[in-house]
């Protein structure tokens, strides 16, 4: 990868490389895309029992409010995906969920929810039964975290 030779790249290249390295090291990792133009990684930390924000460009771990509080971004949609799942994780990254909801106008919320659910179920269907169970349990815990 040219990125490792030059050590120059944008957030997308760094997030792709970091996510791939995490997976190669045996971690569950997924790429996170923010519609206002930034990309980073989430890594599942077994000891924590949850997904952790990891931004290789900023060299930060588990500081999900960095973008709104530190950078002053007005996030709209933040979607995490891997070859096993896809999920709207916006709530993890926003300070005020109600204000965020007012900014989300690109697509109908119900349409987005249904389409993410359908895609997630297709990805889960490609997994072994034991993995499906783990993914479903993690998903339920994550939904509690995001909505609680």
Where are these regions (language model features)?
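Cysteine-centered nucleophilic/redox motifs
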Residues: 3-32, 41
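A generic structural motif
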Residues: 44-46
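Alpha-helical and coiled-coil interaction segments, frequently adjacent to or embedded
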Residues: 1-6, 10-13, 33, 48-148
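Core residues of folded domains in eukaryotic genome-function proteins
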Residues: 25-28, 37-39, 50, 75
């Amino acid at each position: 990868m040219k990125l490792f030779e030059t050590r120059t790249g944008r957030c997308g290249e760094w997030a792709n490389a970091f996510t791939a390295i995490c997976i190669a090291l045996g971690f569950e990792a997924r790429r996170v895309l923010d519609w206002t133009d930034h990309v980073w990684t989430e890594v599942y930390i077994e000891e924590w029992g949850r997904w952790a924000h990891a931004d290789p460009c900023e060299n930060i771990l588990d500081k999900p409010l960095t973008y709104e509080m530190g950078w002053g971004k007005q996030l709209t949609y933040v979607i995490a995906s891997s070859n096993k799942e896809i999920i709207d994780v916006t709530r993890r990254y926003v300070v005020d969920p109600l204000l965020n909801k007012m900014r989300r106008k690109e697509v109908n919320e119900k349409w987005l929810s249904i389409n993410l659910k359908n895609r997630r179920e297709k990805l889960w269907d490609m997994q072994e039964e034991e993995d499906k169970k783990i993914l479903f349990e993690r998903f339920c815990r994550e939904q509690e975290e995001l909505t609680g």
